[in-house]
Design a protein with these regions (language model features):
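Short glycine-rich anion-binding loops that position phosphate/pyrophosphate groups of nucleotides
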Residues: 12-15, 38-39, 71-73, 105-109
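Residue-level preference for the first positions of well-ordered beta-strands
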Residues: 4-7, 97-101
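Glycine-rich, highly charged phosphate/nucleotide-binding loops
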Residues: 79-91
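Charged helix-capping and loop-helix junction motifs
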Residues: 48-49, 82-85, 114-116, 120
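Short, basic, glycine/proline-bearing loop/turn elements
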Residues: 1-10, 74-76, 151-155
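Glycine-rich, flexible N-terminal cofactor/catalytic loop recognition
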Residues: 1-66
Length: 157
């Protein structure tokens, strides 16, 4: 039986803003994946999303780590190639029956690199779940004591 890929939002940077659901999934998954500068585990441990999760869920450091090379570039060919490579790595691990928590800075529904890998994993017939988090624009408004929208006002994201 295949594992499940959980694309997990780690929020805007404060480990205390990691959701209870995200923490539970990180605890239950034997494998943690992160988008990194390279496939070296040391690069994966330097990712902000990994550091947030490790601060909130200390057992994160004892899990198998997949550092998925996701370069910050607009070079389409390079992006497509690295997305395919990441998807292959994920699918191979998921087909071993292991669940994976792919950590994402911010929220998985807003400019998340896991979107591309999740699509390929779904197309391979493997289950994917997206775990939402606290978006940075909401986290920024809270300490200011500001409402982002009231009454008949519109809020556009």
């Amino acid at each position: 039986m295949n594992g499940t890929l959980y694309c997990v939002s780690t929020g805007p940077g404060d480990p205390e803003l990691l959701t209870l659901k995200a923490a539970r999934i990180i605890r239950q998954c034997p494998v943690i994946a992160v988008s990194a500068r390279s496939t070296a585990a040391s690069d994966g441990r330097q990712c902000i999303a990994y550091k947030i999760a490790a601060a909130a869920v200390p057992e994160t450091g004892q899990k198998e780590l997949l550092a998925l090379h996701m370069p910050m570039t607009r070079e389409r060919e390079l992006l497509e190639r690295t997305h395919r490579e990441a998807a292959r790595t994920l699918i191979e691990t998921l087909r071993q029956g292991k669940d994976i928590a792919w950590l994402n800075l911010g929220d998985v529904s807003i400019y998340s690199s896991s979107t591309y890998g999740a699509k390929a994993v779904r197309e391979a017939g493997v289950a994917v779940e997206m775990v939402s988090g606290v978006p940075s624009f909401c986290a920024a408004a809270a300490p200011l004591g500001r409402s982002l929208a009231e009454g008949g006002e519109e809020l556009q994201v």
